[in-house]
Amino acid sequence: MKILNSLKTAKSRHPDCQIVRRKGKLYVICKTNPRFKARQR
């Protein structure tokens, strides 16, 4: 999982990527290709 300052590029890396908010942090999750997972600082 990458830790990024901005998730704008992370969500457009794959069509299945979606942004989720958990416990006050923003995550990008991708079911089909889990290597695109990311979290915002």
UniProtKB/Swiss-Prot annotation:
Regions crossing the membrane: none
Keywords linked to the UniProt accession: Ribonucleoprotein, Ribosomal protein
UniProt superkingdom: Bacteria
Coiled-coil regions, chain positions: none
UniProt cross-references to InterPro entries, sorted A to Z: Ribosomal_bL36 (IPR000473), Ribosomal_bL36_sp (IPR035977), Ribosomal_L36_bact (IPR047621)
GO molecular function, one term: structural constituent of ribosome
GO biological process, one term: translation
Stored SUPFAM superfamilies: Ribosomal protein L36
UniProt key word Zinc: no
One of the record's GO cellular component terms: ribosome
Family under the similarity heading: Belongs to the bacterial ribosomal protein bL36 family.
PANTHER family associated with the record: 50S RIBOSOMAL PROTEIN L36 2, LARGE RIBOSOMAL SUBUNIT PROTEIN BL36B
Name recorded for this polypeptide: Large ribosomal subunit protein bL36B
